[in-house]
Amino acid sequence: LGIVPMATEVAHICGAAMGHFTGMGVEVTADVPDFTGVLEAFQSLRAVLFATLMAPILEQNRVQIAPEIIGNIERGLKIDLAQIFAAERVRIALYQKMLTFFESHDFLICPAASIPPFPVEQRFVTEIDGKPCATYIDWFAITFALTMTACPVVSVPCGFTATGLPVGVQIVGKPPGEAALLRAARQFEQSLGLAKQLPINPHNGRGVI
């Protein structure tokens, strides 16, 4: 979507998976709607939600809340109406862009995350392929950007890294187009042969490649 850095291996795996759509008789293009301003708009709306739900908790139990969450809540408390209106305008404009996109396209496809799975001991990702992340949620910004579209989305596995870690794509359908989206996702998953495959071998804990 051109909004955050993408790990080279993830981009390669997802790009290779697009060949399966071509094999299914689908024309694949590099066309993408304009997502300018979407991340900042989402961050503003998210912060307002955090402040709405958690400001009382922050007052009572600040020491028990992670610093990143405190930052979200405090940001939300500082956001004014003008910023909320601006974020909502971005959301509305994006929805219109998606409708225009779907006049000539059936689906929008992109990676499910910017990086492969990282160690459970690691709280969050601070850089992607050497490029620093602006926030602690940048590594999955490509998912919440699609939340802003108000379109149906499904995530489907599409391959594995060299170390056996799973990688997936998100398929976005036109609203309301859940039935067509699920059919396309099922056909894609079957074409990859991953429908019944375990990402991790339960006997040895190693990835299946």
Q: What name fits each language-model region?
A:
Residues A86, F118-W139:
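Short, surface-exposed loop/helix-turn segments at secondary-structure junctions
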Residues G25-T29:
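A generic structural motif
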Residues A47-L99, P111, I115-P116, V120, ...:
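Short helix-loop capping/hinge segments that flank enzyme active sites or metal/cofactor-binding pockets
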Residues F35, F42, G71, Y95, ...:
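Tryptophan-centric aromatic hotspots in well-structured domains and transmembrane helices
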Residues T8-A11, L39-L49, P119-V125:
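Short glycine/threonine-rich loop-to-helix capping motif typified by GTGT followed
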Residues L1-V4, D31-Q43, P67-I79:
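Flexible, acidic loop-helix segments that line cofactor/substrate-binding pockets
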Residues D106-L108:
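Short, Asp-centered acidic motifs that coordinate Mg2+ and/or phosphate
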Residues I3-V4, A11-M24, I79, I84-A86, ...:
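Structural helix-boundary/capping segments
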